[in-house]
Amino acid sequence: MHPSEIDWVIMGVYFAFVLGIGFALRRYMKTSTDYFLSGRSIPAWVAGLAFLSANLGAQEVIGMAASGAKYGMATSHFYWVGAIPAMVFLGVFMMPFYYGSQARSVPEYLKMRFDEKTRGLNAISFATMTVFSSGVSMYAMGLLLNLLLGWDFDTSVWLSAAIVLGYILLGGLTSAIYNEVLQFFLIVAGFAPLVFLGLKDLGGWQGLTERLTHVATSQGFASRAWSSTWSQMGHAASNPMGVEWFGVVMGLGFVLSFGYWCTDFLVVQRAMAAHSMSAARRVPLIAAVPKMLFPFLVIVPGMIAIASSTHMGASGFALPHKTDGTLNYDLSIPMMLSHYFPHGMLGLGLTALLASFMSGMAGNVTAFNTVWTYDIYQAYIHRGASDHHYLNMGRVATVFGIALSVAAAYVANHFNNIMDMLQLLFAFVNAPLFATFLLGMFWKRATGHGAFAGLLSGTAAAALHQALTLSRGSPVGIKGGWLAVLHLYPSEMAQNFWTAISAFTVCLTVTVGVSLVTRPRPEKELVGLVYSLTPRPSEAGRPWYARPAALGAAVLTVTLLLNFAFW
């Protein structure tokens, strides 16, 4: 692909604007709270779009499109089952604890609820996960620039890292949040025309489903395997995802989704930056409204790509293969951009892709520098320093967080679908963590010793499950089977779901067991940290759309209707 001058101008203006926001906000970064939490001054709608956009990284755009090509419409489970219910739960039940406790991070809340060792364990595991997640976005960006512009992969990765480093170093979380709002609108503007052109080329939704019928039957599945969500979930072998309904509901819908959306500081940080408790509770609910529509923006392009690639006709393009002979699903979006967009629109589409990658990188790096500075450096390395010292350490953490992310980008190249890699990371870190939070917030008997033992055991259970299982067609190694292959899963996704279920179950069981034989904290120390001991926020006199419970119920109702519509 050879972008024209207008394409380069569009991308150049975007990069200049992004860095300009960082420069403009630099003079407001006077304290560590300004830098790490935006001074808790962000309006609900801005924080809501940033909450959504922080998750619109490589896993959302490249990863979901890849999963759309690989698994079909069933990928929408990551939204309608694996995101919306958890986002509603966060806003209605969990934000009062996060925001009301005045904790500066999720690990700090764990310290307040449990003890220092539980906070330290979570801080280290979370910092590691954010580095890998940021690395995935860098890998995707390097892949894109290498494919579409012909740039060397190494150069592409380091260039993208330098740009993200620039605006976070200058403007901190505030710069990241306002850039994420800009990136949200760019992503919608860039990909909506792509879906329209792709569907028009295939003869509309009916033409797409007819092509997908051929895709499904050619691989030995029922005709609707790629175009339905639930109808083929009765047995793992009857759908390309290789997962039965229980794995979707329990593994994705409960453990992985609640573990990510309710405990991952990357997204929770945006809500904690809101200007009030009421605004903080509405942030994930505001984000849930556009979130439920995103399958049509990012999954459908992948379905169009596999339909066109398998049954070439009007489209005339095919997904390339990796060196191991597998289809490179991660190139679904780039290949469609190259095929459908003329010059000018191509610049907009490329800018939308770049925006999504930079959003994902920035979200992870801002979460990393906060957790490193507050929960590792201040807690264990240098206590009692001035606020200015921690502000400077946050900037230093931004630099080495970016450097570690670059290293993680090269690890991501071992997966032919980056969504599979990310679900594996979440299974190791977020799945056991959600069990800890669930017990900590809703069971006052849970103790610090129980939480610590549960987190360690849950992560160990995830590692053991991964070491003893493998997905069909995967080589022994990073994808599993390190010790032995006792069970073979139909797909990597199924393996990841059951890894998460194992981690959650073991963590929950061990935490309860150890808590019952150790001394709990006095109830007076748990006020504001446990549901039964915390006063309920008053919602009297507010319209329904400003009341989290009513807004959450409306969001869940629409989501349920979408599940039935594409059953």
Predicted regions, residues:
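Membrane-embedded helix-loop-helix hairpins and adjacent transmembrane boundary segments
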Residues: 1-567
